[in-house]
A protein has these predicted regions:
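S-adenosyl-L-methionine
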Residues: 92-132, 139-142
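Conserved SAM-binding loop of SAM-dependent methyltransferases across substrates and taxa
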Residues: 74-87
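C-terminal substrate-binding/active-site "lid" region of AdoMet-derived donor-dependent transferases
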Residues: 149-205
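A contiguous loop/helix-start segment that scaffolds small-molecule binding in enzyme catalytic cores
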Residues: 1-43
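Conserved alpha-helix/loop element of class I SAM-dependent methyltransferases that forms part
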Residues: 47-64
Length: 214
């Protein structure tokens, strides 16, 4: 058996029947929820703290075969695609720069179950029907919820927000769209900084809801 670097063998012709075993000692051998932000592609996106992302993924409660729609939730979309590796992720990114960064992350993590789109107002019948959705709340939230419930009347939703003005309106929007709020929580993460001082991270509100409950 001959041992050599793949880069030294890739362009060589093979004249006889042969088999090649490729060993990558740096390959990831397992997945741990809540990847460090340094794992993701830099760019226009400001990623949520890994600890908060881990809680969000727990609240999404993904099965490996489920489909998920992520609205402006880039790192959530990446980890959801890894967790639900037999399902599909529709990543809605309204900004061109964010779509570019998302595409870089898809390549970086070798994902083949992510579809990146720039709009969800008219959810295409060609896109996978989502079992669950994660949304970063914005002024488009009510329209997004209406679209998701239309596509799947029994969809589960998890909503993230740092904005008080939007946070106070979310319960009403959920009920108006036939989604029963099941849990509301606020998360806070503090870390020790370089000067041995406690640095408080942004403390988002997380809303969970279920549509179509009898």
């Amino acid at each position: 058996m001959k041992h050599n670097l793949l880069s030294e063998m890739i362009d060589r012709g093979v004249n006889v029947s042969a088999a090649m075993l490729i060993n990558n000692p740096r390959a990831h051998t397992g997945y741990r929820i809540g990847l460090d932000n340094s794992s993701f592609s830099p760019g226009t996106i400001r990623y949520v703290a890994p600890e908060i992302r881990a809680v969000i993924l727990k609240k999404l409660n993904l099965d490996e075969g489920e489909n998920i729609c992520c609205v402006s939730g880039e790192s959530i979309a990446v980890e959801a695609a890894i967790a639900a590796h037999r399902g599909n992720v529709v990543a809605v990114e309204y900004k061109a720069g964010d779509r570019q960064t998302m595409e870089e992350n898809v390549v970086r993590f070798g994902l083949n179950n992510v579809q990146i789109v720039d709009d969800m107002e008219s959810y295409s019948h060609r896109w996978p029907v989502p079992d669950v959705a994660f949304l970063v709340a914005s002024d488009k939230l009510d329209l997004e919820l209406k679209t998701l419930v239309h596509v799947n009347p029994k969809i589960r939703v998890v909503i993230y927000t740092l904005e008080f003005s939007i946070m106070s309106r979310i319960p009403g929007m959920l009920w108006e769209n036939g989604i029963e709020p099941t849990e509301i929580m606020q998360l806070e993460v503090s870390k020790v900084g370089r000067k041995d001082e406690i640095e408080v991270q942004p403390a988002p509100w997380i809303f969970s809801g279920q549509a179509g409950r009898e």
